[in-house]
């Protein structure tokens, strides 16, 4: 550390949170290591199986399933790594300092509370960004390495986040939310719980509304058609009397083409429609979501800095009567 | 070392209320006013819960006064941060750091001011290994590390909240010596609170007596002692017009501590009170009139001339 000549305050933050830094580094390294293992050892077994299956009536798909499933696990860990950041930021980074009074130790050294909070946020933000970026790059590489063995498409909840900067945005937001809740509550355990809950709620809310973050595509066809490949299917149905009628459980008319035609005429079905996000919508959707999360992070950071003077500040500018 | 006003610490009508409850409850400090000239060693005494810690935290810029204004080294407490040392009552330190890492933290957080040899000497005098973790230290050893942190930043004003409470007599004597040497060498103003008056007698030259959230007595200890007389005589002796701090009648005998307003009546035996007697008399009699903040301020001004 000394070789890098880090200035005093960031160096102190690093020294204080060295255990967390080690755990975070180990987590990132372990996940990348696991991805490398999956894409060298497990994937080759899966590809061998797939090649066998292409030429045989019956075959074993256990290795393919294993590869797909484990890749999804990695995506889940990458996507929700922000929850760990939230818990740490709320409890260890700020909450414990306020509870035990060590924050006051720092504030009575030559460091103002605002600089203290800035360093407490900036150093972890930098290291979180580095770690998450490494995870995202590794995951993207792994995800596109063996498309035939994949379990789930780009639309799956965790893969959607793990393939892009939203992972970094969620982690930074968790950091800011953790700091804000810790400054609000000033207790380690409540801050841990609330920070975790707030970050989870943000994930949950955006997962629910993700499909609305970018305008979807509607395709109208005269006859019922299969879905385009690799799209995020949102809704499909028939057009009856000029109105859309959604059919969640499949078409109302079944059978051979003549039967379908007869049924459609009877129901006055004039066409079929499909609402979906094509694969090209991944980046617009992803970037809008990242932007929302970063906006929440910025808001939480501003609130934290505005709350800080109420925790400690001297000499309110008041005139004395 | 002294600033333009010559006062290290000034409080003007300072009040601090905890919680939002209205009414009498919640005030830790009320209408508190005093001036402490630079270069003094000031004892802040008072019973438990009198507001001593609140006053020191206000001076350290860790609390905002609800009303009034605190001035530290001629400026507001936040701006004076780098020039003020503070050791809180519970001596907060990072438990997972070693002694050496704690001192390195002090050096990092106080660039340009840090006096590493002083810090190392204070720690070494307590036989603390630099590799020992803070959580493995006893209460007294932690106090030593906290004092090393506060002293090595070469503060102009050093605020110590019950600094000697968990030190053994030997360490107490030695660290008091270190503090006094610092005060003498660099002209550091030291403000230390305690509820053990004996601990402060002989090393402090200024007194701030706080009771019930108010300043009861403030001034140079010598002047305060001179201004008070312990008298004894016959019970029917009238003590008017002198200010009676405490009086006790046993049988036909009267003994009292008074602040004389003029020549004393004939037939009274007088003696000089000790600091402890003076403090205890005021603490036992909360209704006894103290010196008003204005008087204290004028006394302080006289003292600086």
Residue positions per predicted region:
Chain B
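Conserved ABC transporter NBD signature motif
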Residues: 67-80
């Amino acid at each position: 550390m000394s070789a890098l000549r880090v200035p005093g305050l960031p160096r102190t933050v690093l020294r204080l949170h060295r255990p967390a830094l080690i755990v975070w580094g180990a987590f990132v390294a372990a996940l990348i290591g696991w991805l490398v293992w999956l894409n060298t050892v497990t994937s080759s077994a899966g590809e061998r199986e797939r090649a066998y299956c292409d030429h045989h009536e019956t075959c074993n798909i256990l290795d393919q399933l294993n590869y797909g499933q484990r890749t999804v696990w990695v995506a889940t860990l990458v996507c929700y790594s922000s929850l760990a950041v939230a818990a740490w930021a709320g409890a260890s980074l700020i909450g414990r300092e306020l509870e035990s009074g060590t924050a006051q130790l720092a504030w009575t050294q030559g460091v103002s509370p605002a600089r203290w909070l800035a360093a407490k946020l900036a150093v972890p933000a930098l290291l979180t960004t580095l770690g998450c970026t490494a995870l995202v790059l590794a995951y993207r590489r792994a995800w596109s390495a063996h498309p035939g063995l994949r379990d789930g498409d780009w639309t799956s909840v965790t893969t959607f986040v793990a393939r892009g900067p939203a992972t970094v945005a969620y982690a930074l937001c968790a950091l800011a939310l953790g700091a804000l809740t810790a400054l609000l509550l000033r207790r380690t355990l409540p801050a841990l719980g609330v920070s975790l809950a707030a970050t989870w709620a943000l994930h949950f809310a955006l997962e629910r509304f993700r499909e609305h973050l970018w305008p979807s595509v509607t395709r109208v066809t005269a006859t019922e058609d299969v879905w385009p490949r690799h799209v995020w299917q949102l809704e499909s149905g028939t057009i009856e009397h000029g109105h859309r009628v959604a059919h969640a459980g499949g078409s109302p008319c079944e059978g051979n083409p003549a039967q379908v035609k007869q049924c459609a005429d009877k129901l006055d079905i004039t066409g079929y429609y499909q609402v979906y996000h094509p694969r090209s919508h991944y980046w617009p959707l992803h970037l809008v979501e990242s932007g929302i999360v970063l906006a929440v992070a910025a808001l939480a950071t501003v609130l934290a800095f505005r709350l800080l003077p109420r925790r400690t500040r001297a000499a309110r500018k008041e005139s004395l009567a | 070392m002294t600033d333009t006003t010559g006062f290290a610490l000034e409080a003007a009508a300072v009040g601090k209320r905890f919680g939002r409850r209205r009414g009498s409850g919640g005030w830790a400090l009320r209408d508190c006013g005093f001036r402490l000239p630079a270069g003094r060693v000031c004892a802040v005494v008072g019973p438990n819960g009198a507001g001593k810690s609140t006053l020191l935290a206000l001076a350290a810029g860790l609390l905002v006064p609800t009303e009034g204004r605190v001035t530290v080294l001629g400026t507001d407490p936040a701006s004076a941060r780098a020039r003020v040392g503070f050791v809180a009552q519970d001596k907060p330190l990072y438990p997972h750091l070693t002694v050496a890492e704690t001192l390195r933290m002090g050096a990092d957080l106080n660039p340009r001011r840090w006096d590493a040899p002083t810090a190392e000497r204070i720690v070494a005098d307590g036989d603390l290994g630099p590799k020992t973790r803070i959580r493995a230290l006893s209460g007294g050893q932690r106090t030593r590390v906290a004092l090393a942190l506060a002293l090595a930043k070469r503060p102009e004003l050093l605020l110590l909240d019950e600094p000697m409470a968990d030190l053994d007599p030997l360490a107490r004597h030695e660290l008091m010596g270190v503090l006094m040497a610092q005060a003498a060498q660099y002209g550091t103003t030291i403000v230390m609170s305690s509820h053990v008056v004996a601990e402060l007698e002989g090393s402090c030259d200024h007194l701030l007596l706080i009771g019930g959230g108010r300043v009861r007595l403030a001034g140079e200890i010598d002047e305060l002692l001179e201004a008070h007389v312990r008298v004894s005589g016959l019970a029917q002796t009238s003590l008017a017009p002198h200010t009676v701090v405490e009086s006790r009648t046993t049988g036909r005998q009267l003994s009292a501590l008074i602040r004389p307003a003029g020549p004393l009546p004939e037939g009274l035996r007088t003696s000089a009170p000790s600091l402890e007697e003076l403090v205890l008399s005021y603490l036992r009699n909360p209704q006894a009139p103290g010196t008003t903040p204005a008087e204290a301020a004028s006394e302080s001004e006289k003292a600086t001339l």
